[in-house]
């Protein structure tokens, strides 16, 4: 019997459901659960009009907010928030680069600014997306198709590039990141485009570099983000609202890089 929620209640679903038994789950670190059951991947509920949520701890109140605007935070929002927390604070004269200006990168720029990262360089190969990145709060931008992308990134960061958040995760972004970082810099990888890049192992001790992965985020972090949205701290990234029946065209547009921000599907009128 369900008595903790009411019909018509507007909630955002946290989809990264942990096993509930391991130490990570008991500490609300669902993203570290080795047996995570993801709604939409490992259990039904993605690209659907309904889904089953087993516990109200995975529901976040969004009453009064536009659901389409905030729903990306249950994926891209917590992903970059979690990674930026792991990154740690930077000094006022230090810089962070955000590699990739897709939906994940756009949210990263906005959330990084809300978390106190003041010097942000957005990196992408699409000038249109770089323009959008400036509107989202990036301080500077770099088109990494430039043959001198490493040195250009170092110049833009005034020799103080202490953090890179890679939201793409390809061979090219990894290669640029580890070469451009200043000594004691931190490379956080969240993107999963795939690929390999090489770097001399000796760079890790000689540059005192941190290379770390981060996977999605946790339910308390989602609540923090939604509270930041309510407080007006997070700038709204572009949202492309489409009917669920147009999903195939949306996938095609994503594959061809024709989307700025995030696509959010909404049920068709007859659903």
Language-model-detected regions and their locations in the chain:
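Glycine-rich beta-strand-centered segment in the early N-terminal region that forms part
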Residues: 1-23, 63-65
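Mid-domain Rossmann-like dinucleotide-binding core that forms the NAD(H)/NADP(H) cofactor-binding site
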Residues: 8, 64-147, 151-152
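A general structural signal for well-ordered alpha-helical segments in protein cores
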Residues: 19, 48, 59, 77-80, ...
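NAD(P)H dinucleotide-binding glycine-rich loop of Rossmann-like/cofactor-binding domains
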Residues: 19-99
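Glycine-rich cofactor phosphate-binding loops and adjacent beta1-alpha1 units
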Residues: 88-91, 115, 125, 131-210, ...
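C-terminal hydrophobic helical "lid"/dimerization subdomain
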Residues: 175-178, 183, 219-271
């Amino acid at each position: 019997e369900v008595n903790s929620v009411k019909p018509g209640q507007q909630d955002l679903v946290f989809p990264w459901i942990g096993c509930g038994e391991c130490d990570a789950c008991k500490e609300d670190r669902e993203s570290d659960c080795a047996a995570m059951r993801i709604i939409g991947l490992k259990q039904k509920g993605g690209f659907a009009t309904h889904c089953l949520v087993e516990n109200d701890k995975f529901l976040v109140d969004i009453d009064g907010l536009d659901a389409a605007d905030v729903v990306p935070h249950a994926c891209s929002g917590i992903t970059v928030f979690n990674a930026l927390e792991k990154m740690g604070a930077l000094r006022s004269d230090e810089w962070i680069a955000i590699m990739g200006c897709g939906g994940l990168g756009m949210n990263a720029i906005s959330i990084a600014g809300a978390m106190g990262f003041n010097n942000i360089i957005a990196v992408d190969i699409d000038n249109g997306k770089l323009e959008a990145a400036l509107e989202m709060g990036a301080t500077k931008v770099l088109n990494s198709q430039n043959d001198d992308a490493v040195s250009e990134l170092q110049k833009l960061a005034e020799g103080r590039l202490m953090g890179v958040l890679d939201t793409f995760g390809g061979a090219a972004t990894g290669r640029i990141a580890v070469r451009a970082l200043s000594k004691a810099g931190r490379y956080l990888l969240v993107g999963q485009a795939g690929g390999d890049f090489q770097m001399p192992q000796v760079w890790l001790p000689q540059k005192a570099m941190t290379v770390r992965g981060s996977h999605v985020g946790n339910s308390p972090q989602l609540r923090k983000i939604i509270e930041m949205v309510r407080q007006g701290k997070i700038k709204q990234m572009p949202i492309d609202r489409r009917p669920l029946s147009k999903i195939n065209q949306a996938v095609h547009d994503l594959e061809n890089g024709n989307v700025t921000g995030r696509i959010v599907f909404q049920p068709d009128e007859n659903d």
